[in-house]
Amino acid sequence: MSKALEIRGLRKVYDNGFEALKGIDLCVEEGDFFALLGPNGAGKSTTIGIICSLVKKTAGSVSVFGHSIDSELALAKKEIGIVPQEFNFSNFESVWDIVVNQAGYYGLTRELAEQRAETYLRQLDLWEKRNTASRMLSGGMKRRLMIARALVHEPRLLILDEPTAGVDIELRRSMWAFLKEINQRGTTIILTTHYLEEAESLCRNIAIIDSGEIAENTAMKTLLKQLHRETFVLDTKEPLPDTISIAGFETHKTDEQMLEVALEKGGSLNAVFAALSEQGVEVTSMRNKANRLEELFVSLLAKS
Amino acid sequence: MTTREQWIAFITIVRKEIRRFLRIWMQTLLPPAITMSLYFIIFGALIGSRIGEMGGFTYMEFVVPGLIMMSVITNAYSNVVSSFFGAKFQRFVEEILVSPMSNNTVLWGYVLGGVARGLLVGLIVTLLSLFFTRLHIQHIGVTVGIVLMTSIMFSLAGFINAVYANNFDDVSIVPVFVLTPLTYLGGVFYSIDLLPEFWADVSRLNPMLYIVNAFRYGVLGVSDVNVGTAFLMVGVFTLLAYGYCMYLLNTGKRLRQ
Ligand SMILES: Nc1ncnc2c1ncn2[C@@H]1O[C@H](COP(=O)(O)OP(=O)(O)OP(=O)(O)O)[C@@H](O)[C@H]1O
Ligand SMILES: [Mg+2]
């Protein structure tokens, strides 16, 4: 399979002298659903900015479906659809004009542009709003408008920079379903997000970037296997005795009727329950303290 | 992109630019119409009758070409500077920057938008002037040629201004503090023959003098300066401005971080 994106030794020093990227390598295969994660200021948007030529790189190389952004920029740009982190459309134009004009910038005939605009505005549930000035849309609608705009020239690589920031749960789930569907139809997707649950449920491969360096780059499954500690939160029927402890497990009483138990890799939950029964504690419910990827993320960043 | 795709992209920008200034006609088309009508009434009709002749014409006939040209210049310039700066300010210039169209396509799309507004306002002002005077265009080629070249030149200059502008003040500085004074002193209201030798020579350093006079030559058949020089000068300035715009776009200066 060919590479949708290939980044080698990418460095970025901003005009003020700040080094936002310290020579990163990144590879995304065609057809992949790829998560680019990292804390605030890690360099995710900088990387994306360089890929779509809004930010000038200091060193290194980037190619999109084999087209180098140095020698074949126009060809590379045609393959990319970009949904930026910040809203960047005209406040005074209508939803329809924004999407149709964008198609025009890519050289699509008016007829095709209007046809595509209708398709994507309907799919993203914006058809009713097509004649509305963009400033009058809600935050979630604005995000979807940027997705429709990014798709109108049918790029092979779709890059979304925090597409679900400020989007309610229901809408987020429908956006996930939509993205999964277009990925299944063949579009390679790269996504950044701070909702790790989102990355876990959507993405097959993942890179974690921290302070301008790649801290981890692997398959989601491999990464989750590395998880050697999981914390569970147990709610109990009666107030817990002060002396509560479970041999071989780290516990933490967070509330009268709430106990946190850390389970090391290979540990048995049965042992936990056996110990609790012995002490007369009845558990009414149990949940993960954090999303699994989240725990991993925190421990990875703590290491680096 | 193929030539045809570039053409579609170009037309998309031009259409968008024209729709923009038509949509906000209260800010773009109405003010020059009102201001110029006032000039016609005050300078032409009220004061003009006392001034008598200027360069062999009634004062009204003399000022009309300069006022039309002034409208073309400020409107072509303002259109590009405010539209492109607005795109930068609201960040939707990124829609264009990420697209595969060439820098020439982007530049000429915006320039043609400026030319369209310059010409439309010029036409409106010309039609209004017909309420006050008659116009017999003497040299149609010179008239059309100088208007077109001038509107292109000032659209390009407006683009440069937009790239460098950081706020809305920077957008109005040049029209208010440079274009308007230079045009006023560029022989819109008087023939430089009336000036003392020294000030006439100083006036000859003002590019607006050549533009206004070339246009007046087209309309009335008289000029204070050589019309060929005027065309040469506008041509050279246009090329320089074009070169500089392309330099800005090719390097991404102030547009890409
Ligand atoms: N134009 C700029 N000039 C100077 N420094 C910049 C500029 N843009 C970004 N930076 C810095 O570069 C670093 C990386 O920023 P970037 O926007 O890429 O982070 P991010 O990973 O997208 O963060 P977030 O999750 O908050 O969006 C930050 O420290 C930021 O302050
Ligand atoms: Mg970011």
Regions found by a protein language model. Give the residues of each.
Chain A
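Catalytic Walker B motif of ABC-type/P-loop ATPase nucleotide-binding domains
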Residues: 158-161
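Conserved catalytic motifs of ABC-family nucleotide-binding domains
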Residues: 154
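Conserved ABC ATPase "signature" region
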Residues: 100, 104, 111-129
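Conserved ABC transporter NBD signature motif
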Residues: 60-71, 75-76
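Conserved ABC ATPase signature
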Residues: 133-137
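ABC transporter nucleotide-binding domain
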Residues: 176-264
